[in-house]
Amino acid sequence: LKAIEKYLRTKLKLTINREKSGVKKPVQFTMLGFGFVPTYIKGDKGKYQLVVSEKAWKRLKISVKAITRKTKPMSFDERVAKINEVQRGWLNYFRGASIYGKLRDVDGWLRNRLRYCIWTDWKKPERKRKNLIRLGVDQDHAYAWSRTRKGGWAVAQSPIMLTTITLKRLKQRGYIAILDVYTELNPSVYEPPYTRTVRAFFFKKVVV
């Protein structure tokens, strides 16, 4: 390793990042937001699949939270358009990784963030009551929920919002589910992850 470092410094005039350089096991290695985990397939010992690092997942959530913050002066349609843009850009970069399972959790979380925006946009109790009735909630439940002391994020995850602000209604407002974007960009999503050409995709990303 020292010989390699010397060659990089003296011959190629490259700066070495000590934190990111070294001999590591694949599961300890992350680069450009990617990492590796074992395939966990019987008989496939020593094989790994490409995944997204935890830092990259956190960055995605931070971006979405910034867009859906109630203090952000944006209309609902503007928020939806911005989220669609962010998630498509993120998936374009990470589409070669095995992320379908984790995306299902993110998909539900994204919808709740939009429900949170809708609930906070309604602001006054009377407006909340009327809108809930328009969405099919009976008078008594609409009144009770419009006066609830629960916070906006708790209400966004409650049955009253899950059954009224459905995925179908969100799509009617222009929202594109992150799972739909992923399957569009990655038609091979239903193939076993260990059948994909991980090495070629990864090093193509590194070179580019």
Residue ranges and their predicted role:
Residues 1-208:
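Non-catalytic terminal/accessory segments
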